[in-house]
Amino acid sequence: MTEHTSYDVIVIGGGHAGCEAAAASARMGARTALVTHRFATIGAMSCNPAIGGLGKGHLVREVDALDGLMGRVADAGGIQFRVLNRRKGPAVRGPRAQADRKLYAAAMQSAIRETTNLAVVEGEADDLIVVDGRVTGIKLADGRSLACGAVVITTGTFLRGLIHLGEKTWPAGRVGEAPALGLSRSLEAIGFNLGRLKTGTPPRLDGTTIDWGAVEMQTGDDPAEPFSVLTETITTPQIQCGITRTTIATHEVIRANVHRSPMYSGQIKSTGPRYCPSVEDKIVRFGDRDGHQIFLEPEGLDDSTVYPNGISTSLPEEVQLALLPTIPGLERVRMIRPGYAIEYDHVDPRELEPTLQTKRMKGLFLAGQINGTTGYEEAAAQGLVAGINAALAAGGGAPIVFDRADGYLGVMIDDLVTRGITEPYRMFTSRAEYRLTLRADNADQRLTDKGIALGCVGGERVRFHRRKLAALQAARAVATSLTITPNEAAKHGLTLNRDGQRRSAFELMAYPEIDFAKVRSIWPELEAIDPVVATHLEIDAKYDVYVRRQSEDVDAFRRDEGLVLGDIDYAIVPGLSNEARAKLTAAKPWTIGQAGRIDGMTPAALGILAAYLRREARRNKAAS
């Protein structure tokens, strides 16, 4: 798309959130600009070279279900695929892929380049243009101005980014790239109170100097399981990763120098991610352990750089050089680049509506680390939702809210806008109350129809989705129609309750010890079912009774979510306590359900709100 001076939507930042936001907006038909320093940095993996994992893999599948980019790009760049928790139930399994950094970035850049309605504008966004309380454009550092109907800010760690390496500090968005200073000032001028968060990265190692024979080797799954339903097979060559551990000697080096770590010297005062601690934090907090696991992850097929996952650190460079040889396999390793920590600005996510539009400024949307999250996948999911809603806002359409029963992206956004954060937010399956239905394997069944209705899913995905649903429905109909008595089942080696009742092939697969292969051996007509469809059918059967039970909880949840509070003046709602009024006014919840998730909100206050909404609805109906 040719560069213009006016767009429907402008997305600032070309990271994981920005790419999804820009592509989603463009798929919605909005003329979109992606503003980034350099096209060459689009899709860069700033930290670990991996996509997915526990909870995170669910988000990637949900992004894919809404025709997002991350799943397909990870499939193109993935060099080791593994499903985590494979021995556990499907609801908590997490697809993950080790990626080749160059292949991943190239695939993302290609996807952005090929997206209709999307232009990439190289430059630094320096200020927001605001007219009558609404964002109407942006100013670039080189003096250019771009007009628009909505802006999505996805700046990652660039907002007043400050790198820490031992006692040294310098401004940067990531190593080798300048921070974004103007946007922080612009957000503060609007009235946002910016907080500070911290993240870190480990040193990079020369893989040719690692003693691979001294470490455990880990292979990927064979065959590899793709992220995207549109990917038939993984064609990229696959690699092994190594596993080693820190030692007592490693811990001694760290303890002797921990006072030089910015986290412990007082140099860094912001909070880092709880579930991705630095190696010095591990030694201080878990000093009784004799070792901590390290995954040696190659960064590419033609790149000898290795990412040592598990030793993120901001200790001085000379200390990092001293601790590495104490680790088995790394005795003679060459450090290519030291690890470091980075602090950056973020906005309190309670300043956001569930659409990811800010409450204090119409037309302004935020996604990714600026909202207090950590991780590529969390950023991508937010970017997609923000991009869809920015396009809807620019076009005058009604916003879309994904709730906690829709998917992990709904869980994450609700957690952020309702509860806020005290540390970088990471997705886990344990955060979802409806995780039996929010599985990685059924993301398309949950979300693709919504995407089609919105207009962000089209083309080949629509045709594929409809064929898949039709095949699954047909397979379920066949499996439900085939029945057997307990006596007949016994002839096939199955032990069932001798109650005389006939059970279908679908019902039999609900038993833990009975899989699709077993029922197929009883009924040869099931052999015609596609293996992928058969896997979905078996999982649906295993969870069927629990899903039907959970659907009652979802219905009750959705009734509360259907009671929209809007812009209520809580000062005029009779019966509310002063404490409840203060909490509601500060949080500005979207629905009764969201109000109920505010810390300290009482059932009595919720009852008063529900009664008030009913009275207002009757009054408005009578007036009309």
UniProtKB/Swiss-Prot annotation:
Q: Tell me what organism the protein belongs to.
A: Bradyrhizobium sp. (strain ORS 278)
Q: Name one Pfam family in it.
A: GIDA
| NCBIfam families to which the protein is assigned, alphabetical | mnmG_gidA (TIGR00136)
Domain of life of the organism in this record?
A: Bacteria
Concerning InterPro entries, the annotation shows:
FAD/NAD-bd_sf (IPR036188), GIDA_C_N (IPR049312), MnmG (IPR004416), MnmG-rel (IPR002218), MnmG-rel_CS (IPR020595), MnmG_C (IPR026904), MnmG_C_subdom (IPR047001), MnmG_C_subdom_sf (IPR044920)
Q: What is this protein called?
A: tRNA uridine 5-carboxymethylaminomethyl modification enzyme MnmG
Q: Where does FAD bind?
A: G13, G14, G15, H16, A17, G18
The record's section on HAMAP family has: MnmG_GidA (MF_00129)
